[in-house]
């Protein structure tokens, strides 16, 4: 990946989702809704951590709004011609520059929960993928 979007989003390790779901089902809590998010991070930092973990160069170019608007249109044309599924859609291009922040305090308080870091999740997944090569 050479490019990174300018946005931010909430990320969570799938193991945390599974564990929190099981803990909630096993508890006496009912009728509540929870946001299960480990960390709010910029795409730049997540993409950098992924690159480092996979021994690849870190992304260095900003995927600006105008660049992403052009990219999703070109991708749509390419996929129309090749009859393939789009990897970058209008929606993903536009949301990738939004700054979304999620609050996980409610689930932390309810379960006394401690989330894994996203760096840990990335390293766990990367080590698995690198072993497959």
What is the predicted role of each segment?
Residues 5-9, 34, 95, 109:
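Conserved short-loop catalytic and cofactor-binding motifs
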Residues 6-8, 85-90:
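Short coil/turn segments at secondary-structure boundaries
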Residues 11, 40, 101:
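Short aromatic/basic micro-patch
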Residues 12-15, 116:
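Residue-level signal for the nucleotide or nucleotide-sugar donor/cofactor binding architecture
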Residues 20-86, 109, 118, 122-133:
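Mid/C-terminal beta-alpha module of Rossmann-like enzyme folds, strongest
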Residues 43, 88-103:
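Active-site loop of classical SDR/Rossmann-like NAD(P)-dependent oxidoreductases
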Residues 112-113:
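A short, basic/aromatic helix-end/turn motif that makes direct DNA contacts
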């Amino acid at each position: 990946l050479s490019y990174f979007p300018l946005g931010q989003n909430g990320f969570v390790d799938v193991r945390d989702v599974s564990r929190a779901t099981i803990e909630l089902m096993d508890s006496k809590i009912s009728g509540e809704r929870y946001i299960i998010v480990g960390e709010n991070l910029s795409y730049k930092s997540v993409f950098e951590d992924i690159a480092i973990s996979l021994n690849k160069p870190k992304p260095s170019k900003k995927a600006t709004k105008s660049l992403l608007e052009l990219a999703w249109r070109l991708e749509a044309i390419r996929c129309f011609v090749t009859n393939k599924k789009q990897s970058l859609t209008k929606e993903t291009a536009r949301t990738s520059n939004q700054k979304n922040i999620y609050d996980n305090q409610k689930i932390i308080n309810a379960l006394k929960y401690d989330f894994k870091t996203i760096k840990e999740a990335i390293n766990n997944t990367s080590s698995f993928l690198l072993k497959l090569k």
